[in-house]
Amino acid sequence: MATLRVLPEAQAKVDVFREDLCTKTENLLGSYFPKKISELDAFLKEPDLNEANLSNLKAPLDIPVPDPVKEKEKEERRKQQEKEDKDEKKKGEDEDKGPPCGPVGCNEKIVVLLQRVKPEIKDVIEKLNLVTTWLQLQIPRIEDGNNFGVAVQEKVFELMTALHTKLEGFHTQISKYFSERGDAVTKAAKQPHVGDYRQLVHELDEAEYRDIRLMVMEIRNAYAVLYDIILKNFEKLKKPRGETKGMIY
């Protein structure tokens, strides 16, 4: 039978790590998770996340609306210049020039909320990773019979994986908001006479505000679900066969 020789001092280090991980996990379940559930629930009740009139979220767009007559004259001069100018390189440079307006800032109300939410996303993902590692280290050696507890572990692990995927998506969602808003602002600046582009910027802000509230709810729910399912199945998760077994890895 093949065996792997592990030095006693190496095994001792692994055992210390496992014990420390178990202690941290039990502390999370015993105090940290309930505290975060309460904090995030209170956050959801704050006025900042309960704006009834979303028009109050509008950020000023410092993009002047051009005079139609002057714009028409300017367009005619540009067309005439293009006919006279055969230098394709110069034309390309002209097209790359920025819009004739000052810098357009972010929506400060949205940014302030995201500054509060992003640390919460980072925190819940880190805590979820810790608890997931703890669960994986409770998996016993593979053998026939008495595997009901192992099946419970697998179900909880599947839930944790789904939660992790959802929470990780929040980072992409936030980046996508800024990218889409930047594109909308650029279009509004290049074509200031088109009101739809200006409105699009405000619509994106309102959509992100709703998404931020949903993010906070999902983070709170993640803590609550983890706390509930682990607490209900703690004995099966920690001792799936009624006694402590070695690691699968």
Curated annotation (Swiss-Prot):
Recorded hits in Pfam families, A to Z, give: PA28_C, PA28_N
Task: Fetch the PANTHER family from UniProt.
Answer: PROTEASOME ACTIVATOR COMPLEX SUBUNIT 1 (PTHR10660:SF5), PROTEASOME REGULATOR PA28 (PTHR10660)
Q: Report which superkingdom the organism of origin falls in.
A: Eukaryota
What family classification does the UniProt entry report for this protein? Belongs to the PA28 family.
- Note the InterPro entries from the entry: PA28_C, PA28_C_sf, PA28_N_sf, Proteasome_activ_PA28, Proteasome_activ_PA28_N, Proteasome_activ_sf
**Molecular function GO terms recorded:** endopeptidase activator activity
Gene Ontology terms: biological process: regulation of G1/S transition of mitotic cell cycle; regulation of proteasomal protein catabolic process
- Self-association and partners: Heterodimer of PSME1 and PSME2, which forms a hexameric ring. PSME1 can form homoheptamers.
Mind listing the UniProt keywords for this protein, alphabetically?
Proteasome
Species: Bos taurus
Give the CC-aspect GO terms: cytoplasm; nucleoplasm; proteasome activator complex
Q: What is this protein for, i.e. what is its function?
A: Implicated in immunoproteasome assembly and required for efficient antigen processing. The PA28 activator complex enhances the generation of class I binding peptides by altering the cleavage pattern of the proteasome.
- In its UniProt entry, what is this protein called? Proteasome activator complex subunit 1
Listed Basic and acidic residues bias regions = 68-98
Renumbered to this chain, region (Disordered) spans 55-102
